[in-house]
Amino acid sequence: MAIQNGLRNRILFLVIFMKFYNREKELNYLKNYVQLEPNSILFVYGPKSSGKSTVMLRVIEELSKKDDLVFFYYDLREYATPTKEEFLEIFFEKGDKKYLLNRFEINLKIFKFGIEEKFDFDNIKLNDVFSKMKESINAVIKDGKKPILIIDELQKLKSIYFNGEGKGDKSLLNELFNLFVHLTKVRHLCHVICLTSDTLFIEEIYRNSTLENTSEYYLIDWLRKESIRNILKEEGFSEEEVDYCLKYLSLPYEISQLINNKKLGLSVEQTIKQWINIERDKILYLISTQKEFEMGKLIDALKLFENKIKVDIKEIIRDNLMDEVKFLIKNEILFYDVMNGIIKPTSVKKWYAIKEVIE
C-alpha cells in the first residue's frame, strides 16, 4: 500500500508542478519514441532529481488516453534492496487476465503483469517468471495494442538471484537483460525503458559486450537556464532575484522549494546559502569519515572542479584519480555522463559546496 501511495503522491506533484518545468524537448522525444517500432532497450539517465520520473509519468499520463498503448510501469525506489518475494509482488497481480490495471492507480492506466490466483509464488523458477511476462505482453499484442515496459531504478534488482535448477543461482538482472533484448531487438514486441540516476550502473551496461548494439541512452539533465528564468519570472521573482538564482539553480525540486521558502519569508540568498552550507557539511563529513581513501586524494579529486564545472574523463584518468572519483559518484557528489565522457557535480549548488570544501 505504501508503494502505491508513494506513486499517487508523485502523480499529484506532477499535475501541480509540471507546468513549471519546461521539459517539452524530453517529453516529445519519449512520446515519439514509444510509438516507434521496438528495436532496442532505452536507458534514460541523469543526475538525481533531474526529473526523469516526472517526465516519464507525464508521458504515461498523456499517452494512456490512447486506446492502443498499454504501460507497465514499475517503480523500485520504494525499496532499499528488494527481495525476490518483493520483486514478484511488485511486478505481478493475481487475477483472471493476462494483464491487469494497477488497482490503486486506475485513473493513470498503469498495468501489471497478470498471473492466475492459484499460482505458487513460493516455488516459482526464473523461466516461469519470464514465461508469465511474455504471456502478458503477447496478450496485449493479441488485443491489438502496443505494450511498453518501464522500470524506474532497475539496478535495485542487482542482488536478486533465482535457483538455476542445478546449474547455480541465476542473476535476475542479467537474465532480464537477455529477455529485454529478445523483446526489443530480436522480436520487436515491446518497448523496454529503464530509468536510473546510478551512472556507474549505466557505465556497466555501456561496457557490457552482450548489450552492444541493443541499447540506446537518453540524458535528462539539469534544467536549461532559460526555462528557470521563465519559471521564476512567472512566479513573480524580481530581475535581481532571477539573476542571482540563475547562478545556483539546476534541478526542478530546487525551484519549488525556493518558491515555497519565498512565501515563508526567506530571501533567495538565505535559502541558497543554507543549501550550500548543508551540501558542504555533507561532503566534509563523507570524506573525513570514510576509510577507503586518503582524504588528501579525495580533495585532489574535488580540486579538479575548482575552476570549471565539467571535467573530461581523460583528465581524471591521466591524474590517476578514477577510484576516488567513482567513490564520489557512488555517494552522489559527482555525476558521470557516460555517453559524453564528462564528470560534473550532481547539481550547480553542489559545485559551489565543493568550491567551499577545497578553499
Swiss-Prot record:
Keywords on record: ATP-binding, Nucleotide-binding
> Binding residues for ATP, per the UniProt record?
G46, P47, K48, S49, S50, G51, K52, S53
Q: Which domain of life is it from?
A: Archaea
* Entry keyword annotation includes Nucleotide-binding: yes
InterPro entries reported for this sequence: AAA+_ATPase (IPR003593), Archaeal_ATPase_domain (IPR051667), ATPase_dom (IPR011579), MJ1010-like_2nd (IPR049081), P-loop_NTPase (IPR027417), WH-like_DNA-bd_sf (IPR036388)
- UniProt xrefs under Pfam families: ATPase_2, MJ1010-like_2nd
What are the GO MF terms of this UniProt record?
A: ATP binding; ATP hydrolysis activity
Question: Has keyword Nucleotide-binding?
Answer: yes
Where is coiled-coil annotated?
none
The Swiss-Prot or TrEMBL record describes its family as follows:
Belongs to the archaeal ATPase family.
Write down what this protein is called. Answer: Uncharacterized ATP-binding protein MJ1006
This chain's source organism reads Methanocaldococcus jannaschii (strain ATCC 43067 / DSM 2661 / JAL-1 / JCM 10045 / NBRC 100440)
